[in-house]
Amino acid sequence: MNIIDDLKWRGAINQQTDEAGLKELTENQSVSLYCGIDPTGDSMHIGHLIPFMILKRFQLAGHHPYVVVGGGTGAIGDPSGKNSERKLQTMDQVKHNQDGLSAQMYKLFGHDENFSIVNNYDWLSKISLLDFLRDYGKLFSVNTMLNKEVVASRLEVGISYTEFTYQILQSVDFLHLYRAEHVQLQIGGADQWGNITAGTDLIHRLEGNDAKAYGLTIPLLLKADGTKFGKTAGGAVWLNPERTSPYEFYQFWINQDDRDVVKYLKYFTFLSHEEIDRLAETVKTAPEKREAQRRLAEEVTEFVHGKQAVVEAENITKALFTGDVQSLTADEIEQGFKGVPSADVSAEKQNIVLWLVDATKFEPSRRQAREDIKNGAIRINGEKVTDVEAEIDPSAAFNGKFVIVRRGKKRYFLAHVK
């Protein structure tokens, strides 16, 4: 199946500058294409992942993707999707963020000869102000630029000349890559349509109307409840494991709504059409098994964090469900118990009642602690404690780093042994 037909089946195409021309181009040859990302932070979140999943599909189909990490445009600020001016970053911040994003890109695409990361600072920084105005500014109509959605949406609240010129800079990126690397396709989110078409227009003006330069945008991904995909009550879901642990990442996907899961399987996995159709059927016939959600979580977590991260996430999930926490490693505990109530405790042995009340503050009183212990409601590191005279050794398990306390079936507490 042609890559364009595959993307249409997945619901991943919003607009194309020339559908027939692009389909013909991708059928007959390997195409170089690009997507840009400005280094406004040092990590992508799952919202950023959407266009780069498309880029990855092109790579797997034999094409050559380029990622433009915008060291130049990132110093300016893209007005797309913003209702106010971006705060300008220092060049040191931009460089730090570039390095973080580039590392993530190589993890997703591999150090492959058919994948390239480039920095638009390398060519934009060489253009003088006079050259910019003469060679490029002269080719852009202010009237046309004002009518682009990305600018028009900002006119009431105001837009600086700096951000106003952003679409010219992005157009220069496309022109440079077209000339230097024979890049013929730019992809981006739906809000990038104005910037992308400005680039194809510039190429056609300077290289001729028969120049094969195309644009493709991806729809805004909405959840079944109408809200924007990628946001949670706890904020963004990051690709950086220091910000969002692989377990939390896995849990985000496994907890998706039945109404959304098939759409996400199409967008975020490389499963075949037949396998996705089969999983879609299980959502209808056996939704309680959540097979589609589990497969989604496995596939996306492996793509971003690797196979071992999936194994660890499933170990944590099983341990928390069954209460068998003894099988967990210290690293898995750190991931799985992030966000549960916790406290630092000493490594000294102590009476269990005093430890629960004084050291951890887990129990409100000694009377309550004794009652819970006698009733078998307290488990320490997965083992039931029934003796109120028992002594706890905080350094006895999990490399002497943690003590896991559970009351009843769901109330967990994590003690960090210092």
Curated annotation (Swiss-Prot):
Stored SUPFAM superfamilies: Alpha-L RNA-binding motif, Nucleotidylyl transferase
UniProt keyword annotation of Transmembrane present: no
Disulfide bonds: none
Keywords, sorted A to Z: Aminoacyl-tRNA synthetase, ATP-binding, Cytoplasm, Ligase, Nucleotide-binding, Protein biosynthesis, RNA-binding
Enzyme class: ligase
Amino acids binding ATP: K231
Residue ranges that the Swiss-Prot or TrEMBL entry lists as coiled coil: none
Annotated InterPro entries: aa-tRNA-synth_I_CS, aa-tRNA-synth_Ic, Rossmann-like_a/b/a_fold, S4_RNA-bd, S4_RNA-bd_sf, SYY-like_C, Tyr-tRNA-ligase, Tyr-tRNA-ligase_bac-type
SMART domains recorded: S4
EC number: 6.1.1.1
The S4 RNA-binding domain, residue ranges: 350-418
GO molecular function: ATP binding; RNA binding; tyrosine-tRNA ligase activity
Binding site for L-tyrosine: Y34, Y166, Q170
CDD domains according to UniProt: S4, TyrRS_core
Family according to the record: Belongs to the class-I aminoacyl-tRNA synthetase family. TyrS type 1 subfamily.
Protein name stated in the entry: Tyrosine--tRNA ligase
Organism field: Lactiplantibacillus plantarum (strain ATCC BAA-793 / NCIMB 8826 / WCFS1)
